[in-house]
Regions:
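Phosphate- and other anionic-substrate recognition elements at nucleic-acid/protein interfaces
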Residues: 2-11, 18-144
Length: 144
């Protein structure tokens, strides 16, 4: 374990209007593992599932993917992510950090295309992979 890092897990959330990709770190914050993608029907259902994950996985922090354009401007979905962040802060007693997720979906698509050799991978798989990539990148940054 890296000196100075508290034992606990980090949950990554790749927010979407229909699906929410999730990944969680191991206790040493070294490896990201994908969790089942959540379907987004209503906020109450999502928050109850997230509360259960936070409890079961002993999550101490959430990193929330923040999609901004390549030029650095806030996108429409970026504004929705900011709203979702406020909702999470009101309902969970955890630090929630925004994480630039530019290109994670594109990287996910390329990985799946290479593995499956199909041009259109399922959206739920892309959401899950995006969360894994985002969290693994974050874990690499905090270990430096």
């Amino acid at each position: 374990m890296v000196k100075g890092l508290k034992v606990g897990r980090i949950l990554a959330i790749d927010f979407g209007k229909k699906h929410i990709g999730l990944a969680v770190s191991d206790e040493t914050k070294t490896i990201a593992t994908g969790l089942d993608t959540l379907s987004y029907h209503n906020k109450k259902e999502v928050i109850e599932k997230l509360k259960q994950i936070v409890k079961d996985k002993e999550v101490e922090k959430i990193v929330l993917g923040y999609p901004i354009s390549m030029s650095g401007k806030i996108t429409k979905i970026g504004l929705e992510v900011l709203e979702f962040k406020k909702f999470l802060e009101q309902n969970l007693s955890l630090k929630i950090e925004l994480l630039d997720e530019r290109l994670t979906t594109e990287i996910s698509k390329r990985i799946v295309e290479q593995v499956r050799r199909k041009p259109t991978p399922p959206k739920a798989l892309l959401d899950k992979l995006s969360a894994i990539i985002m969290l693994q990148d974050y874990l690499s940054q905090i270990k430096k």
